[in-house]
Curated annotation (Swiss-Prot):
Glycans are attached at residue 121. One of its GO terms (cellular component) is extracellular region. This is C-type lectin mannose-binding isoform. The lineage of its organism: Eukaryota, Metazoa, Chordata, Craniata, Vertebrata. A motif (Mannose-binding) lies at residues 119-121. PANTHER family: MANNOSE, PHOSPHOLIPASE, LECTIN RECEPTOR RELATED (PTHR22803). It comes from Oxyuranus scutellatus.
């Protein structure tokens, strides 16, 4: 019985330590997720300036990339909690060659999409950057002109 309690207690401590390891290194107000830290910035910037801001913030940082429904839901909840103004939020997906080939700014695989219905539509042949759509609760994406000014979310490793 004593050995069982010791093993159970050890497993609980280990599980707690692993959970803490995921969040130990993110600064306050950053979301820890899958080895990254995410932060929404309320400044309004165009897509390129937002990406450059993330890169200058810390080497290896980029606008956020999203790779699953779970990631999407967690980021949407985080943005809803921490964004101080209403409006759309830039993420790292863009079409730099303007050929309708979407890539993440961190060069991670483009293996998940959460487009809003009817998107991407490249309205006026001028929509090559992607934001989280506020009216969807930040769960859906919309392509939009890269010069639009929005808040943004950076993804970093600390």
């Amino acid at each position: 019985m004593g050995r069982f309690l010791l093993v159970t207690l050890s497993l609980l401590v280990g599980a707690f330590s692993l959970n803490e390891a995921n969040s130990c290194c993110c600064p306050q107000d950053w979301l820890p997720k899958n080895g990254f830290c995410y932060k929404v910035f309320n400044d309004h910037k165009n897509w390129n300036d937002a990406e450059m801001f993330c890169r200058k913030f810390k080497p290896g940082c980029h606008l956020a990339s999203i790779h699953s429904n779970a990631d999407s839901a967690d980021l949407a909840e985080y943005v809803s909690d921490y964004l101080k103004s209403d409006g759309n939020v830039w993420i790292g997906l863009n079409d730099p060659r303007k050929q309708r080939t979407w890539v993440w700014s961190d060069r991670s695989p483009t293996n998940y999409y959460s487009w809003n219905r009817g998107e991407p539509n490249n309205s006026k042949n001028n929509e090559y950057c992607v934001h989280l759509w506020a009216l969807s609760g930040y769960l859906k994406w919309n392509d939009t002109p890269c010069k639009a000014l929005y808040s943004f979310i950076c993804q970093c490793r600390f």
